[in-house]
Amino acid sequence: MAETWVSEIMTQALGCLQAFSSEFALEWESSDMKAAIFKLLLGWIVLSLTAILLAWKSYGPTVNSIYYRQGMGGQNGGTPEYPARFPVWESSSTESLKRHQE
């Protein structure tokens, strides 16, 4: 089922590309350059956004799993509050604080 969906999209995309290129060729011959350049830039933007969308659909979950790592690192891959190899030193109320004396 996925193959038919992809092939249908590719067929439509190729049809649009063929129509766009034939229209562009006709405008090029008639020297209507403003319209041709506008359509070329518009096509480039649409193509770029489509490529970004397809890349995000393909690699989006991987990027999210890297960005939002689970575990000791906290959110967004930060450092843990207390490194695992160093002990946590907690001061008790009976312990006096050391002060610098001159």
UniProtKB/Swiss-Prot annotation:
Give the source's domain of life in one word.
Eukaryota
In the record, the note on similarity to other proteins reads: Belongs to the TCTA family.
Q: Which InterPro entries match?
A: TCTA
What membrane topology does the UniProt entry give?
Single-pass membrane protein
Q: Where in the cell is it found?
A: Membrane
Query: What are the record keywords, sorted?
Result: Membrane, Transmembrane, Transmembrane helix
Q: What's an example GO cellular component term for this entry?
A: membrane
Recorded protein name is T-cell leukemia translocation-altered gene protein homolog
> Is Transmembrane among this UniProt entry's keywords?
yes
